Design a protein with these regions (language model features):
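Conserved ABC ATPase "signature" region
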Residues: 37, 41-44, 48-66, 118
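Conserved ABC ATPase signature
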Residues: 8, 70-74, 78-80
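Short coil-to-helix segment of the ABC ATPase nucleotide-binding domain corresponding to the Q-loop/switch region
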Residues: 30-38
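The conserved cystathionine-beta-synthase
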Residues: 196-228, 234-253
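ABC ATPase NBD coupling module
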Residues: 1-18, 42, 47-51, 165
Length: 253
């Protein structure tokens, strides 16, 4: 990109990148169908082809039946769905989303996060998602980059950042996170014992929140198993209770 000419950058932007912003930036005089098809018209694609692709994107974001509505006739969440459909119409290789849900009320915001997770499970795009909400980042991301003063100070999985913050800033940034929803059984397990094979089993990747009630109720350790079913450790009810109560900020059981 640094070596590309202005013309090359325009072509890359038109054909390889999709973008969604906090403000929907829909053209008010165009219908939903026309808004979604608009970037394809900029590419010079014929009307029949661009409208066919626009219909596909509208169906993908569950706006069937609203093709001929204008933006003013849609709710905020529906308008953002139009923005998402428009950004995907060009079939981008990289999808940039800059605080796309920040302007929505909490209920609609969560609904749109769920919709994004569904779309990604279908599309398998490379997504760069910008947010100031760490809970949102944890829910959506495989990997998170935390920036301060324009500099990336740590990159890792949500679990990495919560369990092993690189700086005091990252530790403060993640301090109020519900750790039980982020940390896995692997993060809290201790070594396996001779009795581990006869214990209730939990997957190493399972989030603590998914089995916390069960292990506390049982008052017995659970065996932690890897992807192939082998026992790789043991997690105690006390370790889970300490996590839930905030007494244990470390990773050991």
């Amino acid at each position: 990109l640094l070596k590309a000419s202005e013309a090359e950058l325009i072509e890359i932007r038109r054909h390889k990148m999709g973008m969604v912003f906090q403000h929907f930036a829909l053209l008010p005089h165009l219908t939903v169908l026309e808004n979604v098809a608009f970037p394809l018209s900029i590419q010079g694609i014929g009307r029949a082809e661009r409208e066919a692709r626009a219909h596909q994107m509208i169906e993908l974001v569950s706006l069937n039946g609203r093709e001929h509505h204008f933006p003013s006739e849609l709710s905020g969440g529906q308008q953002q769905r139009v923005g998402i459909a428009r950004s995907l119409a060009v079939e981008p290789e990289i999808w940039f989303l800059d605080e796309p849900f920040s302007a929505l009320d909490p209920l609609i915001r969560r609904e749109m996060q769920t919709e994004l997770i569904r779309l990604q499970s279908v599309l398998k795009k490379t997504v760069v998602f910008i947010t100031h909400d760490f809970d949102e980042a944890i829910r959506l991301a495989d990997r998170i980059a935390i920036m301060k003063d324009g500099e990336v100070i740590q990159i890792g999985t949500p679990e990495d950042l919560v369990n092993n913050p690189a700086t005091a800033y990252v530790a403060e940034f993640t301090a109020d996170v519900n750790r039980a929803k982020v940390l896995s059984a692997r993060a809290l397990m201790g070594p396996a014992t001779a009795k581990s094979g006869g214990l209730e089993k939990v997957a190493a990747k399972a989030k603590i929140a998914s089995f916390a009630a069960a292990i506390v109720d049982s008052a017995k350790p659970f065996a932690v198993v890897g992807d192939t079913g082998e026992v790789i450790g043991e997690i105690s009810p006390r370790a889970v209770i300490n996590l839930l109560s905030g007494k244990d900020r470390g990773a050991g059981a």
